[in-house]
Amino acid sequence: MTEKTIALLENRINDLECQVAFQEQTIEELNDALTQQQLLIAKMQDQMKYVVGKMKNMDSSNMVDPAKEPPPPHY
């Protein structure tokens, strides 16, 4: 191989190493974002279960049948 070919190959290897380094950083950032989203989703699911449980336990006698309500006043 000539010196020119070797220099081109070395440059190509350096470029590929830079690309891999940037990809590793991007993958790590995406993994961190995904982890945060998973934690947020889990928290939201717990909150939703709590709200649904509260709604199921509500006394249905407190709710007024819309058919029995008087009509709203007309202006």
UniProtKB/Swiss-Prot annotation:
Give the signal sequence positions.
none
Q: Which InterPro entries match?
A: SlyX (IPR007236)
Q: In terms of domain of life, where is this protein from?
A: Bacteria
What the entry lists under PANTHER family is as follows:
PROTEIN SLYX
Family assignment from sequence similarity: Belongs to the SlyX family.
This chain belongs to which protein, by name? Protein SlyX homolog
Q: Which organism is it from?
A: Vibrio vulnificus (strain YJ016)
